[in-house]
């Protein structure tokens, strides 16, 4: 008989203002741990319910928005356009219902467990198929667990989505430290390497002795770290974003080195795109001064939304079309976009999430000076056409010598799992198929 205790956990919405009353069901999970398991390693069921006062405060802030003048150009060269933001805020204030997001989350098996002194929130959906392959998927910024929700059923229940029963996965989706309902680090050091070790501990704690991992954006950095650490049980990884580069490319893009000789036209284009991407304003500011940008993002929901939208050109165009023209890209709908922004707002996680870039910038500087440990485990990679930069196969092969799968998809962008969940799931099935049954 599993012992249960229900209590209310307060997540601060705004410092000194309104607290979110998140109803959390705490219990020792009989599936993974016995009733006598210490609380430090216990897996506690979790559900969320935001206080009405927090939602009222959000609506009040939206209504009190002080708008800037319209941009002076007809494109997005000056940043997020006023028409896009006004359409988003109009929807957010008058049509959007956070309770629908809560219901969607609470319909899934959610849990919290303490790893390395920090509470880690995660979704864990087990397939009905007996030989399902366990997989841990890591989101990025400005995403969250919201960007991965639509791929859960195609992965866990492939036969309902045109797949085969033998392609099923047990799905584990944690919230990164400092994001969403996970705890916020109180000391420096929660870089991708540390998160990678925590993720392996999570999979072991769930009883998995053999599993795979997937990541894009910040999640790619974590998954890359897992691949380099190569813990016992991790048999392969998949990326949809190249986070590490051949040494000569790394030196040219980040260390001021010369452009490597002999690059193909595609590689030259990729190098230019990589160099430009890592000089974008959000990445530089969050990498250097996350605390500074945290003040306006914590005080203004509209400021937070604009900052999150100004991520990459392809995603911005799709989001703008969703609000201005009513033409969403796949599951990247108005509701899902605002679900994601509202999750950041209600959990007051803009600053703590941005600190991951501060941590990663130091790791990247180390990589320029000292090449990281090579990856020997099997690696799969999918390139999506709307991604910030197109990873050349030659680079992926140099960084990951044991590349077992490389495919260029015909649609999808930086948030590929969000935009094209069925396609993304089919890529993961194909990528990991060679590893099923291999002991």
Language-model segments: what does each one mean?
Residues 155-181:
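Conserved alpha/beta-hydrolase
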Residues 55-126, 131, 336, 345-348, ...:
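Non-catalytic accessory segments flanking enzyme active sites
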Residues 16-28:
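Bacterial N-terminal signal peptides
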Residues 154, 158-160, 209-259:
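Conserved hydrolase catalytic core segment
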Residues 193-211:
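Conserved acidic catalytic loop of the alpha/beta-hydrolase fold
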Residues 98-100, 146, 163, 176-190, ...:
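Glycine-rich "HGGG/HGxG" loop immediately N-terminal to the catalytic nucleophile
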Residues 132-140:
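Short beta-strand element of the alpha/beta-hydrolase
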């Amino acid at each position: 008989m599993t012992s249960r205790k229900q209590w209310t956990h307060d997540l601060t919405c705004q410092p000194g203002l309104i607290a979110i009353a998140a109803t959390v069901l705490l219990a020792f999970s009989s599936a993974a741990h016995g009733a006598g398991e210490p609380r430090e390693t216990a897996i506690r069921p979790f559900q969320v319910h935001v206080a009405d006062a927090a939602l009222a405060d959000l609506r009040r802030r939206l209504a009190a928005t002080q708008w800037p003048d319209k941009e002076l150009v007809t494109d997005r060269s000056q940043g997020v356009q006023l028409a896009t933001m006004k359409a988003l805020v109009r929807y957010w204030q008058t049509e959007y219902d956070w309770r629908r997001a809560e219901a969607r989350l609470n319909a899934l098996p959610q849990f919290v467990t303490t790893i390395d002194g920090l509470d880690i929130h995660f979704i864990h959906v087990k397939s009905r198929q007996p030989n399902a392959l366990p997989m841990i998927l890591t989101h990025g910024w400005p995403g969250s667990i919201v960007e991965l929700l639509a791929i859960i059923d195609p992965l866990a229940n492939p036969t309902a989505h045109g797949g085969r029963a033998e392609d099923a996965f047990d799905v584990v989706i944690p919230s990164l430290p400092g994001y969403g309902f996970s705890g916020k680090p109180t000391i420096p050091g929660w870089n991708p390497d540390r998160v990678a070790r925590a993720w392996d501990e999570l999979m072991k704690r769930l009883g998995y002795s053999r599993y795979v991992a997937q990541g894009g954006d910040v999640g790619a950095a974590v998954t890359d770290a897992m691949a380099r650490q190569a813990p016992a049980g991790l048999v392969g990884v998949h990326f949809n974003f190249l986070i590490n580069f051949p040494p000569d490319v790394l030196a040219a893009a980040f260390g001021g080195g010369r452009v490597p000789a002999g690059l193909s036209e595609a590689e030259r284009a990729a190098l230019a795109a990589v160099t430009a991407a890592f000089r974008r304003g959000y990445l530089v500011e969050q990498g250097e001064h996350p605390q500074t940008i945290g003040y306006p993002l914590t005080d203004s929901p509209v400021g937070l939304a604009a900052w999150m939208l100004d991520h990459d050109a392809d995603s911005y165009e799709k989001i703008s079309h969703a609000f201005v023209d009513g033409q969403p890209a796949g599951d990247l709908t108005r509701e899902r976009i605002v679900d994601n922004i509202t999750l950041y707002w209600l959990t007051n996680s803009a600053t703590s999430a941005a600190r991951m870039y501060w941590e990663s910038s130091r790791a990247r500087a180390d990589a320029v000076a000292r090449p990281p440990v090579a990856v020997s485990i099997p690696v799969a990679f999918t390139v999506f056409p709307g991604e910030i930069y197109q990873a050349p196969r030659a680079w992926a092969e140099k960084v990951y010598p044991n590349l077992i799968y490389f495919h260029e998809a015909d649609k999808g962008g930086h948030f590929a799992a969000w935009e094209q969940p069925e396609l993304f799931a089919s890529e993961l099935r194909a990528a990991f198929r060679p590893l099923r049954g291999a002991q």
